[in-house]
Amino acid sequence: NDNNEKTMSYDLYFYKRKNSDLTESQIAEYLTNNLTSTSESNTQWFVEDEDTETYFSFDQNEPETDEESIELFENFPDFDNTHFTFNLNYLRPDFFGQFAFEFVEKFIKDLDLFVLNPQSTTDPDNPIKPKAKELYENWSETNSRNSANFFNNMNLNFIH
């Protein structure tokens, strides 16, 4: 991800406690059973609401091989990287976030996961257990800011 792309989407990385016996295949199974994905891939869950056209995705990624990425994502004494990520684009109406984060919260709770949130204003460097609505509010604020900047740069009017 180059920096430009990073500002276009909100990405979360999921971790489990070191002593957890949760497997990647169990996480994949949970997503398959709880989401209606339009993706043919068995490593991506792309969820879309046809009525509102809201969408988000989960991906199962290969373990990092790049030194810098290993340093960032694999180096936590208490947590193991599940290699699952969540993605929601910015420049979207607020209800996109409401739709997506309702499921994200359930996913974290049901599987006892922790979240590395690079967009966090309080702790962008460590996996945490987010409070209710914390991720949605974080996305929503960042989305508003990015949208306003985008529309200003394009000389378009943007109504909050």
Segments (PLM) and residue ranges:
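Short, Lys/Arg-enriched N-terminal segments with co-localized hydrophobic residues
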Residues: 1-7
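Acidic (Asp/Glu-rich) sequence patches and key acidic residues
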Residues: 8-160
